[in-house]
From Swiss-Prot:
<keyword id="KW-0057">Aromatic amino acid biosynthesis</keyword>
<dbReference type="GO" id="GO:0009423">
    <property type="term" value="P:chorismate biosynthetic process"/>
</dbReference>
<feature type="binding site">
    <location>
        <position position="95"/>
    </location>
    <ligand>
        <name>phosphoenolpyruvate</name>
    </ligand>
</feature>
<dbReference type="GO" id="GO:0008652">
    <property type="term" value="P:amino acid biosynthetic process"/>
</dbReference>
<feature type="binding site">
    <location>
        <position position="316"/>
    </location>
    <ligand>
        <name>3-phosphoshikimate</name>
    </ligand>
</feature>
<feature type="binding site">
    <location>
        <position position="23"/>
    </location>
    <ligand>
        <name>phosphoenolpyruvate</name>
    </ligand>
</feature>
<protein>
    <recommendedName>
        <fullName>3-phosphoshikimate 1-carboxyvinyltransferase</fullName>
        <ecNumber>2.5.1.19</ecNumber>
    </recommendedName>
</protein>
<dbReference type="InterPro" id="IPR036968">
    <property type="entry name" value="Enolpyruvate_Tfrase_sf"/>
</dbReference>
<dbReference type="InterPro" id="IPR023193">
    <property type="entry name" value="EPSP_synthase_CS"/>
</dbReference>
<dbReference type="InterPro" id="IPR006264">
    <property type="entry name" value="EPSP_synthase"/>
</dbReference>
<feature type="binding site">
    <location>
        <position position="343"/>
    </location>
    <ligand>
        <name>3-phosphoshikimate</name>
    </ligand>
</feature>
<feature type="binding site">
    <location>
        <position position="169"/>
    </location>
    <ligand>
        <name>phosphoenolpyruvate</name>
    </ligand>
</feature>
<feature type="binding site">
    <location>
        <position position="23"/>
    </location>
    <ligand>
        <name>3-phosphoshikimate</name>
    </ligand>
</feature>
<feature type="binding site">
    <location>
        <position position="24"/>
    </location>
    <ligand>
        <name>3-phosphoshikimate</name>
    </ligand>
</feature>
<keyword id="KW-0963">Cytoplasm</keyword>
<feature type="binding site">
    <location>
        <position position="28"/>
    </location>
    <ligand>
        <name>3-phosphoshikimate</name>
    </ligand>
</feature>
<dbReference type="InterPro" id="IPR001986">
    <property type="entry name" value="Enolpyruvate_Tfrase_dom"/>
</dbReference>
């Protein structure tokens, strides 16, 4: 397996960059464009492996899609216009593709099957199957409740669906299924999650009512979706690696431009401010999705406590919060993050293992970590492993910048899932 030497940096990270398009929005723009009438034009599309899995699956479902770099044109087939695929739909490693497509396919007029790679095939899918069944969806899973999934498309009925897990993927699957149902559907969640699906559907013409006080969305089917132009903002989950690096690497001062500032995605920024980071934001646009430039510089950080109520807005960034804690003054505790155990890897375990290799004082807990911050670490093992997890690989690369010991990353290509140009962009700022 490939191994990459990681950079040790004492000069600091300086300059500015724009990160790739947001992964969540790229997925959803493709899918909603496919269900619309007319042409949807997507710019700054994320050309990562997960989003390409969605693109290829939609093509297999009869959708005409043309991509030139980050520019994508989708010729919609309407809400009921998808066609039966000739073979199982390959999801590769993409949980978002899988769960959202389960919702879309549940109301179509044919049977389809979703399959994935070894990692995705271990991830739980009953959590989607159950809520969709409330609308009458017929979805078969393995005995373990995992892929392959067989979706028997047929007419759906509106329902009231109360989600037990705060998950934007599950919520979105129900909303996309509800577009095809007879009668309205109301889906409620225990805590607010990212709302890109709702924002995009409203822009395309769907009839959605959002009740923020009740954390619920009501979908009234029958509205005609019409193709739109979508400019995908920079992915805050990708920007997060540079914001954290800028805070913890000495002599750093950097700006990440045109980042999505959707309030459901700015949890890391709030944590950085709470920890005392020297950070500023210049909002540059506001419309379907607010965006702006975020500037950060080397900061003296204090310990932080993160609990379950904080988790939905920074679920993908929690490993980076753990890294901030490892560099801060004092003892930090992160809890309520059990959802990390069913990501591409068990991220609670793999982050703890990575930190122990680096010499970080970390205690793994069932739903998070207890971390004692230290100014310097004593590396125990130099070979760090991404375990095929894109976010773990990038976390290791950022952590390595603080090391005085040469470090190596096993399976660095995993970062291509969400950020193919990560190492090149790190080099632009001096991290090479």
């Amino acid at each position: 397996m490939q191994k990459r030497a990681l950079t040790i940096n004492s000069r600091g990270l300086n300059g500015e960059l724009a990160v790739p398009g947001d992964k969540s929005i790229s997925h959803r723009a493709l899918m909603i464009g496919a269900l619309s009438e007319g042409t949807t034009v997507i710019d700054h599309f994320l050309v990562g492996e997960d989003c390409l899995s969605t693109l290829r699956a939609l093509q297999d479902l009869g959708v005409e899609i043309e991509r030139k770099g980050e520019h994508v044109e989708v010729i919609g087939r309407g809400i009921a216009g998808l066609v039966e695929p000739a073979a199982p739909l390959q999801m590769n490693n993409s949980g978002t593709s899988t769960r959202l497509l389960m919702g879309i396919l549940a109301g179509q007029s044919f049977t389809s099957q979703l399959v994935g790679d070894a990692s995705l095939s271990r991830r739980p899918m009953k959590r989607v199957q159950g809520p969709l069944a409330r609308l009458g969806a017929q979805i078969g899973l393995s005995e373990a409740g995992t892929l392959p999934a067989t979706v028997v498309g047929h007419p759906l009925q509106g329902a009231r669906v109360k989600l037990e897990v705060a998950s934007a993927q599950i919520k979105s699957a129900v909303i996309l299924a509800a577009l095809q149902a007879q009668g309205s559907t109301t889906v409620s969640e225990p805590l607010p999650t990212r709302d890109h699906t709702e924002r995009l559907l409203k822009a395309f013409g769907a009839n959605l009512t959002v009740d923020r006080a009740a954390n619920s969305i009501t979908v009234t089917p029958g509205a005609r979706l019409v193709g739109q132009e979508v400019l995908v903002p920079g992915d805050p989950s990708s920007a997060a690696f540079f914001l954290v690096a800028g805070a913890v690497i000495a002599n750093s001062h950097l700006t990440v431009k045109d980042v999505c500032l959707n309030p459901t995605r700015t949890g890391l920024i709030r944590v950085l401010k709470k920890m005392g980071a020297r950070l500023s934001i210049k909002e540059t646009a506001s419309g379907g999705e607010p965006l702006g430039d975020v500037t950060i510089q080397t900061s003296q950080l204090r310990a932080v406590t993160v609990t379950a109520k904080d988790v939905p807005d920074l679920i993908d960034e929690l490993p980076l919060v753990a890294l901030l804690a490892a560099c801060a003054d004092g003892v930090s505790e992160i809890s309520g993050a059990g959802e990390l155990r069913v990501k591409e890897t068990d991220r609670i375990q793999t982050v703890a293992e990575l930190f122990l290799q680096l010499g970080v004082d970390v205690e793994e807990r069932p739903d998070g970590w207890r971390i004692v911050g230290r100014p310097n670490w004593q590396v125990q093992k130099p070979n760090l492993n991404s375990h095929g997890d894109h976010r773990l690989g990038m976390l290791a690369a950022v952590a390595a910048l603080r090391s005085t010991t040469p470090l190596f990353l096993i399976d660095p290509d995993a970062v291509a899932v969400s950020y193919p140009s990560f190492f090149a962009d790190l080099a632009k700022l001096g991290g090479a």
